[in-house]
C-alpha cells in the first residue's frame, strides 16, 4: 500500500487579485480504501467541508476558494492570538515530493491527497481569501472550530432568552472539534454571556454568578449540567436544576460523568470555559462527547 502523507498548513497571505475569475469545481469524494485507511490512521483533520459548501477556482489551478453554506463559519486564530470567524477560505494543494497531489473530500472534510500520480507528500495551504498572496507570502492561522447558525440552537436560543425555548437534545450538525480558543471568538463569547444573562437576570433577577466568572470546576448543589449545542458543537452547560426539570432536559450532576473519546488522532480532552464543559479536540479528528 502506498503510504499517504498529509501535511496541513493553514495560512494567511497578503494580497489576492480582486479581478480573478471564479468557476465552480466538483471536488470528488475520496473512495480509495487505502487513502481512507491512511486518513484514519494518521488522524488527519483536513479542512471542514460540510454539505452545501462550494469550491471555486481563483483564476489559477493552484488556488481554490471554499465557501461555506450561509450562516456557517470557520473560526480561525492567527499568530498573534487573534480569533475571528470567516465564511470562506482559500485552499491550495501542492505536491512537495513527486507529482499528482489532488483534492478530495471525506466525511465532511477537504483533503489534499497523494491518491493519484507519484506524489508522496501533499501540502494543504488554507488562508483568508482577502489576503492570499500570489507571491506565496503567508502568515499561519489555525482553525479552532466551526460555527453553525443555521438551526435553532444555542445562539438563537440565547438571543430569545429563556430555557423554555430550547429544544430537547439534538445532535450537532458538524463535529470538526473545537479548542479553548473557539470561545475567544467575539460572536461565541457574546452569545454565551447573553445566555447566562438571560437565565439569571430573567428568572432570578441576578447577575451572572461568580462560579461561572471564575470558571469553577464545581457547580452549586442546585445546579446541573445539560447537554446542548453551541453553534453546532456538543457541550454541557451549567443550569439551575429547576429550569432543567421544567424544560424536560436530561441532566448530569457531576462533571466526572462527562467523557471525551478520540478514535482518530490524539487529543480530545475534557475542558471547560466559563463552566461550559466541552471536548478540546486538539489533534483528534474524531472527538466525541458522552456521559
Regions found by a protein language model. Name each.
Residues 1-31:
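Bacterial Sec-dependent N-terminal signal peptides
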Residues 3, 160, 201, 264, ...:
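Surface-exposed charge patches in extracellular/virion surface proteins
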Residues 5, 83-85, 275:
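Aromatic-enriched hydrophobic runs in primary sequence
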Residues 10-11, 53, 215, 264:
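Prokaryotic Sec-type signal peptides and long signal-anchor helices
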Residues 19-94, 127-257:
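N-terminal propeptides/leader regions of secreted preproproteins
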Residues 90-128, 255-291:
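Secreted, short cysteine-rich peptides and small extracellular cysteine-rich domains stabilized by multiple disulfide
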Amino acid at each position: 500500500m502506498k503510504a499517504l502523507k498529509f501535511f496541513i498548513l493553514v495560512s494567511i497571505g497578503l494580497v489576492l487579485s480582486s479581478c480573478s475569475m471564479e468557476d465552480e469545481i466538483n471536488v470528488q469524494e475520496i473512495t480509495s480504501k487505502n487513502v481512507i485507511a491512511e486518513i484514519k490512521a494518521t488522524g488527519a483533520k483536513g479542512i471542514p467541508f460540510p454539505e452545501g459548501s462550494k469550491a471555486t477556482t481563483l483564476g489559477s489551478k493552484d488556488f481554490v476558494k471554499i465557501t461555506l453554506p450561509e450562516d456557517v463559519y470557520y473560526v480561525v486564530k492567527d499568530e498573534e492570538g487573534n480569533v475571528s470567524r470567516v465564511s470562506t477560505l482559500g485552499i491550495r494543494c501542492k505536491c512537495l515530493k513527486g507529482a499528482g497531489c489532488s483534492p478530495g473530500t471525506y466525511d465532511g472534510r477537504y483533503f489534499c491527497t497523494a491518491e493519484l500520480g507519484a506524489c508522496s507528500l501533499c501540502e494543504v495551504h488554507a488562508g483568508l481569501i482577502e489576503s492570499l498572496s500570489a507571491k506565496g507570502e503567508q502568515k499561519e492561522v489555525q482553525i479552532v472550530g466551526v460555527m453553525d447558525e443555521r438551526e435553532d440552537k444555542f445562539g438563537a436560543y440565547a438571543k430569545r432568552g429563556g430555557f423554555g425555548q430550547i429544544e430537547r437534545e439534538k445532535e450537532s450538525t458538524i463535529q470538526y472539534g473545537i479548542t479553548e480558543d473557539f470561545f475567544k471568538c467575539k460572536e461565541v463569547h457574546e452569545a454565551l454571556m447573553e445566555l447566562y444573562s438571560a437565565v439569571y437576570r430573567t428568572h432570578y433577577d441576578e447577575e451572572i454568578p461568580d462560579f461561572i466568572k471564575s470558571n469553577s470546576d464545581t457547580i452549586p448543589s442546585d445546579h446541573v449540567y445539560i447537554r446542548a449545542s453551541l453553534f453546532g458543537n456538543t457541550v454541557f452547560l451549567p443550569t439551575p436544576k429547576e429550569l432543567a426539570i421544567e424544560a424536560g432536559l436530561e441532566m448530569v450532576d457531576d462533571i466526572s460523568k462527562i467523557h471525551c473519546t478520540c478514535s482518530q488522532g490524539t487529543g480530545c480532552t475534557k475542558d471547560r470555559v466559563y463552566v461550559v464543559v466541552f471536548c478540546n479536540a486538539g489533534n483528534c479528528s474524531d472527538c466525541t462527547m458522552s456521559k
